[in-house]
Swiss-Prot record:
This is Lysophosphatidic acid receptor 4. PROSITE patterns: G_PROTEIN_RECEP_F1_1, G_PROTEIN_RECEP_F1_2. One of its GO terms (biological process) is G protein-coupled receptor signaling pathway. Disulfide bonds join C111-C188. It comes from Homo sapiens (Human). Residues 65-73, 134-155, 225-254, 316-370 are cytoplasmic.
Amino acid sequence: MGDRRFIDFQFQDSNSSLRPRLGNATANNTCIVDDSFKYNLNGAVYSVVFILGLITNSVSLFVFCFRMKMRSETAIFITNLAVSDLLFVCTLPFKIFYNFNRHWPFGDTLCKISGTAFLTNIYGSMLFLTCISVDRFLAIVYPFRSRTIRTRRNSAIVCAGVWILVLSGGISASLFSTTNVNNATTTCFEGFSKRVWKTYLSKITIFIEVVGFIIPLILNVSCSSVVLRTLRKPATLSQIGTNKKKVLKMITVHMAVFVVCFVPYNSVLFLYALVRSQAITNCFLERFAKIMYPITLCLATLNCCFDPFIYYFTLESFQKSFYINAHIRMESLFKTETPLTTKPSLPAIQEEVSDQTTNNGGELMLESTF
């Protein structure tokens, strides 16, 4: 009987585009799906993500490390999120080459590293976003009682725990993958057998989905809902000294990234794990999962481009740094020209920004709060 094989990201089975249409070996077991479109789609999206993600996250890390003081607990979570994005982006050139050429010449080790980087980024991003959401929940709902919990030391410990968790999951999944050679063409992260799916990968996938997606999703929705409900009380805003509109922007951007990038991908992956482990045997669902997987995979990788919006709307000092640097660049552009009016110096600009921050409904506290 035909061993029907399918492709899904890091849990991809045999390459249907590199061999004649698999899945139609018998009349009784036919489920033909042509998903060869995914190679050009993945290659194009990865190229965009590589360029935009490399620029935005590199600039963000530069600002975090050299242009602003990392005083808040949330800044620690966001820095780790940027590092996770940047590490993944650095592996994308290999994936771009593979998808456009449909051949992996880089060896088994880089294949495993590439897969581990993907899992680490996807689930690390969700967990770091969850940390930010929980931190915001504590800061707004329990602004005084949470002071002993919300420390930079505790934030660093939590980040270390997240890295250990996602690296363990990513490495565990990558151990079962290897490069395969078919007709002088080498594939990467394709060729998992039914036995591997039933014995290992289905269990690893379900564990990763529960710990890395379902629990974070529940926490994000719950924390955001409670925060929104708390903000309806006028006394809350006077206690935390911040602006309601700013908090609403933070929550909106945060949840938009989570829902657009991660919910579709993990929903399809969960279905695919059930299909491959034969917990569900339905050709329509197999076709649906195989067609939708590359599309949702591309949405998931776009988180590297969207995360900088979270940095901007979450950290007040991040906005301030860009404001100051923009003025510095404007000064340098007109330095050789005779000015009609005296341009403000950098200290004056910093003082102006500081005054604006102080006067906007206690936004200075926003930095220490979020």
